[in-house]
Amino acid sequence: MIAIYPGSFDPVTLGHLDIIERSVPLFERVIVAVLCNPHKNPLFTVEKRIEQISYCTKHLKNVEIDSFSGLTVEYARLKGAKVLLRGLRVLSDFEKELQMAHTNKTLWEGIETVFLATTKEYSFLSSSVVKEIAQFGGSVTHLVPENVSRDIYSYYS
């Protein structure tokens, strides 16, 4: 079975990688799908985010990195995936993600959403938190992969 793990991943965090690595044994293939959202002003280009994630997941043989725009369920259908993978940190994530799962189901009956609870050490972590810390000169080396922290420091220098 193929699973899609969609997100902006701007930047990819250790929490994202935790979800990816824990999903690998559960599915034949995991596609990490980087969203191209024209309404957001990203820190990194889609191409750079794909490069960052590819570097971090190169040891995972059944992980593929791609990008998409538009509806996630349409992308999943195009890729032959029946599962959307989502990480949950806190209760408010669950409320938002459950609503989205129900919405996606109305768009395509063939899609299921699988939730993975974030490992406790990453329960506070988000890309927004990383960007805010970095913007004010704080260290993010314990929050993102090494290659990503270098890119972040380069961006803010």
Curated annotation (Swiss-Prot):
It holds the Pfam family CTP_transf_like. GO terms for biological process: coenzyme A biosynthetic process. Its cofactor is Mg(2+). Pathway: Cofactor biosynthesis; coenzyme A biosynthesis; CoA from (R)-pantothenate: step 4/5. It is an enzyme of class 2 (transferase). The keyword Zinc does not apply. NCBIfam families: coaD_prev_kdtB (TIGR01510), cyt_tran_rel (TIGR00125). GO terms for molecular function: ATP binding; pantetheine-phosphate adenylyltransferase activity. Keywords: ATP-binding, Coenzyme A biosynthesis, Cytoplasm, Magnesium, Nucleotide-binding, Nucleotidyltransferase, Transferase. The record marks 16 as: Transition state stabilizer. This is Phosphopantetheine adenylyltransferase. InterPro entries: Cyt_trans-like, PPAT, Rossmann-like_a/b/a_fold. Its main location: cytoplasm. Homohexamer. It comes from Microcystis aeruginosa (strain NIES-843 / IAM M-2473). Reversibly transfers an adenylyl group from ATP to 4'-phosphopantetheine, yielding dephospho-CoA (dPCoA) and pyrophosphate. ATP binds at residues 8-9, 16, 87-89, 97, 122-128. Substrate binds at residues 8, 40, 72, 86. The gene is coaD.
